[in-house]
Every structure is written in structure tokens, then in C-alpha cells.
UniProtKB/Swiss-Prot annotation:
The keyword Cytoplasm does not apply. Part of the 30S ribosomal subunit. Interacts with proteins S7 and S18. Binds to IF-3. Belongs to the universal ribosomal protein uS11 family. This is Small ribosomal subunit protein uS11. NCBIfam families: PRK05309.1, uS11_bact. It holds the Pfam family Ribosomal_S11. It comes from the Bacteria. Gene3D superfamilies: Ribosomal protein S11 (3.30.420.80). GO terms for biological process: translation. Keywords: Ribonucleoprotein, Ribosomal protein, RNA-binding, rRNA-binding. Located on the platform of the 30S subunit, it bridges several disparate RNA helices of the 16S rRNA. Forms part of the Shine-Dalgarno cleft in the 70S ribosome.
Length: 131
């Protein structure tokens, strides 16, 4: 006896998130941009690797620019986000370009905050970071 087929499940209604935060983690090897809502739940993310770059090209400012634009585009299309606070961590070469790309993508930037972790004289750095 044939089993009755189930119909398609109804699609969930799109959550509309107007404001959120954009975290830019800029290391020397890569730049990762994560867009969250105000509670900290991840909405969209992108990086130099997800754009299609491999190896040392992931750490370039251009890859950071494309990653930031891609993450903002995902957040705008799926959740209708239009206001963000930008929080930057790290000192990689892509941090400035990522901020510029977020501003240029048509989303309103309310504030920019540098939250780079700085040790209070913790572990001894490697030779290249000790000057």
C-alpha cells in the first residue's frame, strides 16, 4: 500500500531586522565580516575565502572589501537590515577597506568602534611581533 505523500511545509515568514552590528575581524591572513542582530545572533557572514580567494590573497584589502560588501548584501536581502554599528577587531590590512565597503553599500553606519584585543602584558610575543 502506498504511503500518503506529505505536502510542502509552509515557508517561515521572513524576520525583519532593521538594525544590527557588523563585526570586522581583520587578521594578517584573512578578513572575516559577520553581521548580527542586536542580540548577537549571526545573520550573515563572509570572508576572503568565501569570496573565492585562496592563500595570501585572502588577507588583501580588496578581498576584505568584497567580503564586507557580500555580507552586507546578504543581510539586506534576507532580513532588510539598513542600520549597523561597526565593531573592528585586529590590525590586518583589510580593516579600513572593509569599513569603507560597508559604508558604500547603502547601509547606514551609526558608529564605528575599535575593539582590538590588547594584552595587559600577557604572553611573550613571537620574534616578529616583538620590536
Amino acid at each position: 500500500m502506498a504511503k500518503p505523500t506529505k505536502g510542502k511545509a509552509p515557508r517561515r515568514a521572513r524576520r525583519n531586522i532593521s538594525a544590527g552590528r557588523a563585526y570586522v575581524h581583520a587578521s594578517y591572513n584573512n578578513t572575516i565580516v559577520t553581521i548580527t542582530d542586536l542580540d548577537g545572533n549571526s545573520v550573515a557572514w563572509s570572508s576572503g575565502g568565501t569570496i573565492g580567494y585562496k592563500g595570501s590573497k585572502k588577507g588583501t584589502p580588496y578581498a576584505a572589501q568584497l567580503a564586507a560588501a557580500d555580507a552586507v548584501k546578504k543581510a539586506q536581502q534576507t532580513f532588510g537590515m539598513n542600520i549597523v554599528d561597526v565593531i573592528v577587531r585586529g590590525s590586518g590590512s583589510g580593516r579600513e577597506q572593509a569599513i569603507r565597503a560597508i559604508q558604500a553599500s547603502g547601509i547606514e553606519v551609526k558608529s564605528i568602534m575599535d575593539d582590538t584585543p590588547v594584552p595587559h602584558n600577557g604572553c611573550r610575543p613571537k620574534k616578529k611581533f616583538r620590536a
